[in-house]
């Protein structure tokens, strides 16, 4: 019997408008690898389940549905789907995103030729709720090291291909379900960067639907704050796990400097912006921080920016 090469993890909830496009983009991939699509349908009140049932009837040997009742929530639904993935590799596609052609063939060929790589990932095109491309919005960049990822998540889950055996090791080592984190993927990327090798492929692999209602794109400041706090908890956990005492102290000191810099920006304290900006380590100075420091050098420009609010970068 041929080895099951790939499991595609699909988690979906209330996505009747998009789930057919998601499944079609996976089913239409050109390759000869044995594969399965494991779909976690999280007790949607809309017509998502009915659409999935129609696809299961057409592709009973490929699509493996998991119908939750009651609703499990994003994190538990995700790990339940992962637990049912039997392939050598796992790829992901949320029920409102879709893949671009040749993703499977490109990534599995690469992984088969590079056994030292635990996960590869690529670039996504942002789209809106209508499926229209957002101008100049792409996600995915070369951040393959633990230190780079600790500064923030830049890996689009819809573009990844990872080794299933390493996912199993991660779950045993970290037990993420007990942590209460609001992100299912970011902790795993951090763990992978320490226990294998990550590789960025500078190719568009998928389309990511950016919807205002999601936790990471919520327009509600309170929801955004809770999501950001969870990301910070994840970063602290892995910094403690993998850094020695000296490096951990440096990490916390830098985090505090960045926080003070942000607070100075909100309070429009030009002197403090310059003061804290100068001592933030070079590696931690994002493009946004560098731009702020450049612009605040001139008191006149600084005043104009805040009074007229010409440049959005100065708003929190």
Q: Each PLM stretch: what is its role?
A:
Residues 15-28:
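Short, well-formed alpha-helical segments that are part of the catalytic scaffolds
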């Amino acid at each position: 019997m041929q080895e099951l090469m790939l499991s595609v993890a699909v988690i979906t909830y209330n996505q009747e408008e998009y789930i057919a496009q998601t499944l079609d983009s996976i089913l239409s991939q050109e390759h000869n690898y044995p594969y399965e699509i494991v779909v976690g349908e999280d007790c949607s009140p809309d017509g998502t389940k009915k659409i999935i049932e129609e696809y299961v009837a057409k592709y009973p040997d490929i699509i493996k549905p998991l119908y939750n009742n009651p609703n499990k929530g994003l994190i538990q639904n995700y790990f339940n789907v992962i637990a049912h993935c039997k392939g050598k590799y796992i790829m992901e596609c949320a029920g409102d995103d879709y893949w671009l052609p040749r993703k499977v063939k490109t990534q599995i060929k690469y992984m088969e030729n590079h056994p030292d790589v635990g996960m590869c990932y690529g670039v996504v095109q942002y789209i809106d709720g209508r499926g229209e491309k957002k101008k100049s919005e792409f996600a995915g960049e070369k951040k393959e090291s633990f230190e780079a990822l600790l500064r923030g998540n830049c890996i689009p889950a819809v573009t990844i291909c990872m080794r299933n055996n390493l996912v199993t090791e991660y779950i045993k080592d970290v037990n993420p379900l007990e942590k209460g984190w609001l992100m299912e993927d970011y902790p795993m990327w951090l763990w992978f960067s320490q226990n294998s090798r990550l590789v960025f492929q500078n190719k568009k692999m998928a389309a990511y639907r950016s919807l205002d209602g999601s936790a990471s794109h919520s327009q509600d400041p309170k929801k955004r704050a809770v999501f950001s706090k969870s990301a910070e908890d994840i970063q602290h956990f892995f910094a403690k796990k993998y850094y020695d005492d000296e490096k951990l102290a440096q990490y916390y000191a830098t985090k505090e400097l960045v926080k003070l810099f942000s607070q100075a920006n909100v309070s429009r304290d030009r002197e403090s912006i310059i003061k804290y900006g100068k001592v933030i380590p070079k590696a931690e100075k994002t493009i946004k921080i560098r731009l702020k420091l450049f612009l605040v050098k001139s008191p006149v420009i600084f005043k104009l920016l805040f009074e007229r609010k010409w440049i959005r970068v100065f708003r929190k």
